[in-house]
Amino acid sequence: MGKLHSKPAAVCKRRESPEGDSFAVSAAWARKGIEEWIGRQRCPGGVSGPRQLRLAGTIGRSTRELVGDVLRDTLSEEEEDDFRLEVALPPEKTDGLGSGDEKKMERVSEPCPGSKKQLKFEELQCDVSMEEDSRQEWTFTLYDFDNNGKVTREDITSLLHTIYEVVDSSVNHSPTSSKMLRVKLTVAPDGSQSKRSVLVNQADLQSARPRAETKPTEDLRSWEKKQRAPLRFQGDSRLEQSGCYHHCVDENIERRNHYLDLAGIENYTSQFGPGSPSVAQKSELPPRTSNPTRSRSHEPEAIHIPHRKPQGVDPASFHFLDTPIAKVSELQQRLRGTQDGSKHFVRSPKAQGKSVGVGHVARGARNKPPLGPAIPAVSPSAHLAASPALLPSLAPLGHKKHKHRAKESQQGCRGLQAPLASGGPVLGREHLRELPALVVYESQAGQPVQRHEHHHHHEHHHHYHHFYQT
C-alpha cells in the first residue's frame, strides 16, 4: 500500500476484480486522478473534467456525491451498474484534510537529511499538527568542561552527538503520540557572561507519556555529573598545588628579604632552607665574576648563628676562628686580586684591615648596585663592621648574653696593640688578614649600638677599644 501511494502514476491504475473494473484513489491525489479518468472517459468530445469539477467546488466531505453526479451524467445506466469508484479517505476527525495529506506525502517521498532512521508510512498516516504542550526541554550547562576556557565547534558537535544518543536511547518511541524534544546546551566558561547556546529540535523522537519522561531526565543528570566529576577533581588538585606553590614562594621571599635586611647584600641567598649545603661546603665554592668575595656571604651568617641558636651551635659555623693555614692561604690568593683596586681607599699599608677605611667602601657598595668587577670588593666581615642595619639586630641579643666578652676583647685588643703599632715581622699577612674579623666578632657583639654609630659618623674620633694607631 505504501509503494502505491508513493508514486503518482500508480494512483489511477486499473485492476481486475470479480465484480468488474475499479479504481483505488488516495485522498491526496483524488483531484488529479479524477480529472485524468474523466478526460479519458469523455475523450470523443463534450465538456472536459476540470471544468465540471470547478463548477462543483472543492473536494471535501462531499467527494463521494460529487463523483457520483459526474458519473451519472457521463455514463449510461448499463455502464453505471458495472463500474464502481472507491475513494480511500482518512478519518473524519482530521482537520485540513488535503493540506495535511499533501505534507505527509511530501515527507514520505523526500527523506529528511537530519533523521537517522527512515520512518514508515503507517506511522505518519494519522499525524496531526504539533502542539506547544507536547514539547519537552532539557537544559545542560557545562562550566569549563575542557579546562582551558576555549570551546571549539568540534567540541560542541561531539557533545551534541553524545547528548542525542543518550536521549534517543532513553526515550520510549510510541506511534500513538508524538513529542518534540528540545535539547538546549549552554557552555559558560567559569561563570562569565559569554555563552554559546545551540538549539536542536528532534521532531522524529517519540516519547510515550510524561511519567516515562522523568527517567531519561535522571539518566541525563547522572551522565552530566559523571562528565563533570573528573573535571572537578582535576580543578581541586590544581588549586591545592597552586596554593602550596604560592605559600612556598611567599615564605622564601620573606626569608630572603629578612636576610637582605640583615646583611645589606644584594642577591643574597638563604642558607637556612632545606636542602642547602653546609657553611663549610659553601666556603670552598669558586667566586662569582661580578664580585669575588660575594660568594663568601656566609660569613655574616656564621656570626649570626650563635645569637639565633645558642643551644645547638654547628661547629662548622666557627670556621672563621678555626681556619687552618691552607684555607687562609687560599683566601689570601682570592683577596690579592682586589688589593690593587682598593689601594686608594687605604691610607697606609698597615691599615689595610682598618674598619674605618673599609667602612666607606662597604657603605658605597651597599648604597649603589654593583657595576662590575671594577668596583673594589670587601670581605663580609667589613660588611658586618660597617652595616648599621645589622647593628640593631645584634645589640639586643648580644648585649645580655655576651656582656662578659667585652672585657676579654679589651684585653685582647690591648695585647695585640703593641705588635701592630711596631709593624714588626711577628705577624704575617695571613694573621693580619685574619685578626680583624676575629676582633670585630668579639668587640661588636659586646659593645652598645651608640658607640658604633658614633664611630661611623666620626671616623677621626677613636675609642679605647680600637687597637690601630694613626
Swiss-Prot record:
S-S bridge residues: none
Tissue note: Expressed in colon, heart, kidney, leukocyte, liver, lung, ovary, pancreas, placenta, prostate, skeletal muscle, small intestine and spleen.
GO molecular function: calcium ion binding; PDZ domain binding
Compositionally biased spans, kind Polar residues: 192-205, 271-281
Regions that span the bilayer: none
Induction (UniProt): Expression is induced by activation of the Wnt signaling pathway.
Binding annotation for Ca(2+): D144, D146, N148, K150, D155
Lipid linkage positions (N-myristoyl glycine): G2
Compositionally biased spans, kind Basic and acidic residues: 92-109, 210-227
InterPro entries on file: EF-hand-dom_pair, EF_Hand_1_Ca_BS, EF_hand_dom, Nkd-like
GO cellular component, one term: cytoplasm
Disordered: annotated segments: 1-21, 90-114, 192-228, 271-314, 337-357, 446-470
GO biological process, one term: eye photoreceptor cell differentiation
Subcellular location: Cell membrane; Cytoplasm
Domain EF-hand per the UniProt entry, residue ranges: 131-166
Subunit structure, as described in the record: Interacts with DVL1, DVL2, DVL3 and PPP2R3A.
Family: Belongs to the NKD family.
Name of this protein: Protein naked cuticle homolog 1
Originating organism: Homo sapiens (Human)
Gene: NKD1
